[in-house]
């Protein structure tokens, strides 16, 4: 029987019993803030149970789409690890709203299972709430189930509640006995005594009698009612004779589709875990989007994003490095579209949303995953079992890597994440952002002057032609208020009618300088321009009192201005050189020009090679040595563009613009201050090159004396290196190359010796294999310090054993390294390398973990290495089944 046929038979059966077939409600619960998603069939009838709503029927039956991911009912982390758990599933149900109660519910369930589905009655067991004598008797009376197949259980298992509050009541679960061949090793393997795959819950009958309030108090519902839920996928697995829900016709086609995309064959064991996750998540993503949820950062949208990105990550584990999940939407629709037309109607939209989210996530994942793997490797080496909050926050803040994804990946490797530390780092960032906002507020305060200065004329800037001038104080400000004077030691702002001080703009920092007047003076700490063009000087009065109307002398800090102009002119040279070397696609994306150095951001698709960096540096220095004239002119914007001047993308320009021209080499629109000729820059040195965003690179550089100092430092370092190599400086490179070649040859010889030694060591180690519960186990201390070599040795030993468990330990620099390997057949017998090594490493004050077949760990106590290895035998004995 197919899954679709099962759904149809269920609905028709209950329709024949007077039930109204009600279509599935949305996965977004209507008017119910207590639930993230619809997670059971009764959700759409909650108000009916509470007596707040009435329907034109007292009996209903549904096939309800459900999601359990997030909130109290969250199966996300167990999906794919078991044969039964899903984020998305269908719940078949029959409901009574004050119509029938326990007797009829039990009668209908038994009839459907044994007569319609023809399940063998002797395979069916039931559980009842320990205090529900009525249900206990009814199962014997109606179904003839003997008392030994009716198990009383406690509130945890047999008292159902939808959430922390709301309708609830005792329940009775119908269990299908899959047979002793599926039994576990528990003694006894019995319903209620173990939770293995032999005992498959297929139907839960909830006898809705109470409502639980926020204080945990129970009160009778207005009308006792029935709510039942049967897992469609579970019953389909029984009817189709398969071991897992993932093997049913409801999900198996999705696994086949993943096989086709990956070119890999599905393994129903642990190796097939990624296939099962992807198949499940494709279903939940499709249905969530069909019900109007889009990926985002809050609430349901965040859960969808997490599910989608989790599937994408497992696709990467299968070797898929491009968006693929959207391609499974067609398969979901082919299976489910008949029963749920909403997914078929939105098929194209669903696929598009998934693809766009996959594209965004691949950008995040590729960078963040590399960093996280490095963090986990360091933690293993250090014997840590915890990823620090700062490490997790760096992943989140710098790489956009979600905390829950960090926790999930870390957990798979046997690590925990310090969530409290993460929250502290997040709080610290918020505080930094708040402080930054305070700084911005201070700047905005200066901008706010514009509204308070409407009564005064603008400021004339005279600094292109002179560094000293005289002006009149037009206005003074202190602590956000306009004042008439500033006394000695006061800090405030002054607006003059004219000034030679350049106001911050175009990436160039504002000038500093000095004000003098009769009987007083002040330091100019910064200069800024207001939106209306007026120029504000931030000053500190060092002597006397400055009053409105005072005549003052203004002098710019010459040395600082010259250094800034040097870096600004060279920024133009750099821009042109980058275009010449890399291509005309290069455009300025930002800059910072200070007296100390320059920073230039530009559009480019890849990091610069060493050759490109040398070419850029050489070209800029050539133009400096050429002593090219730097000239400026003011013209209209249109004429400047016609002349070929470079304008910054996104920058707003007025009708009149200033053009800075460096001979025939460079011509840009710019309001900054510049040199008279390029030779005044002295020299140019690149300091760094890096990426700051998608398609944006950043270089930092120095000029003049700073570039000379950098060259002198390089020369000194070369002399030091040459001294260590005992050769003249001009022979240092040749000597290093010779040493590198010699080192390669030594490494080749060492590798050969290691292989020979490893073969010898392996033969010796194999003599020390012990048998534990019929399992060959080799715990051994080895003299291997490199973790990669340790893994390789363990792999070779496992290969030679064929079937067995290898646990190797070594010590180096006061630390311990462990590696464990388990053959495939023993993984199936319950031995898990990650769990094994986690316990072993604790003996040596360490931790770690990993997969079932391979794991690594570290420790801090080398003195406990032998004890830890000996303990591994006990752990293996406890795991094997």
From Swiss-Prot:
Gene3D superfamilies: 2.40.30.130, 3.10.310.40, 3.30.54.20, 6.10.250.550, Bira Bifunctional Protein, Domain 2, Threonyl-trna Synthetase, Chain A, domain 2
InterPro entries in alphabetical order: aa-tRNA-synth_II/BPL/LPL, Ala-tRNA-lgiase_IIc, Ala-tRNA-ligase_IIc_anticod-bd, Ala-tRNA-synth_IIc_core, Ala-tRNA-synth_IIc_N, Ala-tRNA_ligase, Ala_tRNA_ligase_euk/bac, DHHA1_dom
PROSITE patterns in alphabetical order: AA_TRNA_LIGASE_II_ALA
Domain of life (superkingdom): Bacteria
Pfam families, A to Z: DHHA1 (PF02272), tRNA-synt_2c (PF01411), tRNA_SAD (PF07973)
E.C. designation(s): 6.1.1.7
Presence of keyword Transport: no
GO cellular component: cytosol
Biological processes annotated in GO: alanyl-tRNA aminoacylation
Cofactor names: Zn(2+)
Binding site for Zn(2+): 568, 572, 670, 674
Protein's cellular compartments: Cytoplasm
Cofactor note: Binds 1 zinc ion per subunit.
An MF annotation (GO) of this entry: transferase activity
Chief place of localization: cytoplasm
Catalytic activity, reaction form: tRNA(Ala) + L-alanine + ATP = L-alanyl-tRNA(Ala) + AMP + diphosphate
UniProt KW Cytoplasm keyword: yes
Enzyme class: ligase
Record key words, sorted: Aminoacyl-tRNA synthetase, ATP-binding, Cytoplasm, Ligase, Metal-binding, Nucleotide-binding, Protein biosynthesis, RNA-binding, tRNA-binding, Zinc
Domain notes: Consists of three domains; the N-terminal catalytic domain, the editing domain and the C-terminal C-Ala domain. The editing domain removes incorrectly charged amino acids, while the C-Ala domain, along with tRNA(Ala), serves as a bridge to cooperatively bring together the editing and aminoacylation centers thus stimulating deacylation of misacylated tRNAs.
Family label: Belongs to the class-II aminoacyl-tRNA synthetase family.
Protein's job: Catalyzes the attachment of alanine to tRNA(Ala) in a two-step reaction: alanine is first activated by ATP to form Ala-AMP and then transferred to the acceptor end of tRNA(Ala). Also edits incorrectly charged Ser-tRNA(Ala) and Gly-tRNA(Ala) via its editing domain.
Matching HAMAP family: Ala_tRNA_synth_B (MF_00036_B)
Protein's name according to its UniProt entry: Alanine--tRNA ligase
Organism of provenance: Moorella thermoacetica (strain ATCC 39073 / JCM 9320)
UniProt gene name: alaS
